[in-house]
C-alpha cells in the first residue's frame, strides 16, 4: 500500500497546515519521536524536555482530537526501584509521560497501549553519533577494525532485542493490547563484555 511521508514536528502537530495531516483519521498513532538516550539527556536537557514533555503533550491532544489509539514507546530505564525514574532527565521524562498518558485515559478516555523496549539493535542502527547505543558503537568500531570499547569490568547486564522482534511485538500490542504496559524483550540478560567477545575481535 502507498505510504506518504510527512516531515513534521510533534511540538507543532496540532497547528500544522498540511492538508493530509488535517484530513487523515488514523486508527493508530505510534509515538516514538522523542529524545531517547540517558547520558546525553544531561547535556541536551533542553531538547529532552522540549521533545519528550512538550512534544508528547501535543501528540496526546492530537490523538484525543482524532479519537485514535496511542501506541507509546516507554523506557525500560525506569523499571525496578522507584528512584530509577529520577536518575536522569530522560528517565524522568519517560516516567512522567506514562503518568500523563494514564491520566489522559481517565480524564479524556484516551485509548492507549505502552510498549517498553530493551536495548534495540539491528539494521540501520545509529553507529557513530552521540545517540548511538552500545551495539551500534561496537558495530562501528568492528567495521573500522578498531578495538571495541568496554568500560571495565563490563559486567553490566542488558537485555538486547532485535528490531524485527520489536516491530512484530509493537504491531501485536497495537492490535490486541489493552490499556497497560508490555515489555518487549528477549528475557535474557547478557554482560556487555560477553557481547563484545561475540564480535571475535580485540577489546
Region roles according to the model:
Residues 1-120, 170:
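N-terminal Rossmann-like NAD(P)+-binding domain of SDR-like oxidoreductases, especially those catalyzing
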Residues 81, 123-124, 192-193:
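A short beta-to-alpha transition loop/helix N-cap that caps and shapes the active-site region
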Residues 39, 58, 77, 125-126, ...:
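Short, flexible micro-motifs
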Residues 50-53, 94, 128, 132, ...:
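Short, solvent-exposed loop/helix junctions and linker helices
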Residues 142-203:
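C-terminal substrate-binding subdomain of Rossmann-fold SDR/epimerase-dehydratase oxidoreductases
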Residues 87-90, 118-132, 152-163:
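Glycine-rich "substrate-gating" loop/helix at the edge of Rossmann-like oxidoreductase active sites
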Residues 96-104, 134, 138, 195, ...:
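Hydrophobic alpha-helix immediately C-terminal to the catalytic Tyr-X-X-X-Lys motif of short-chain
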